Amino acid sequence: MTDNTTRLDHVVLWVSDPVAAAGFYEKNLGFEPLRVGEYTAETVSFPSVRIDDETILDLAPRSMAARMRMLPGADASAGHPVNHICVSLSAHDFDALRARLDEQSIPMSDLSHGAYGARGSARRSFYFGDPDGNIIEARHYE
């Protein structure tokens, strides 16, 4: 049986070094790198990282922007048209992420409490940036 429920499939982030970006997301958030070997072999245009069974982040090199033709003006989106993306973690993984970022001296926002999201009010959340300036929000609900 096929589940045709509407859901998020992927988000594309512009990055300067897709391989380094994949490593960042793997090391800090535990996202599984996909197609990195194929990207370095130049058989695919970009690698991705798997967030969960149904959702991925595509890590598109900024150099690809000039070839974007699917929508007028798409090539101009190589700036930062995405405000931020949010990942929901367990409380344990949330604390572990914050510790990993702190160990690497990656700047983070203060903790917020009760921020609204897809599953209601989060117990805690915070923001940090990836090496390309994309803003990531981490949160947990339980």
Where are these regions (language model features)?
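Exposed loop/turn and edge beta-strand positions of beta-sandwich/beta-sheet ligand-binding modules
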Residues: 43-45, 83, 122
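Short, conserved charged micro-motifs
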Residues: 20, 92-97
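Vicinal oxygen chelate
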Residues: 3-4, 98-142
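Helix-adjacent hinge/juxtasegments
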Residues: 60-88
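A short, acidic/glycine-rich surface segment
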Residues: 35, 66-72, 111, 115, ...
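N-terminal beta-strand motif that seeds the catalytic metal site of vicinal oxygen chelate
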Residues: 1-22, 82-85, 89, 139-142
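Core segments of cupin and vicinal oxygen chelate
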Residues: 13-64
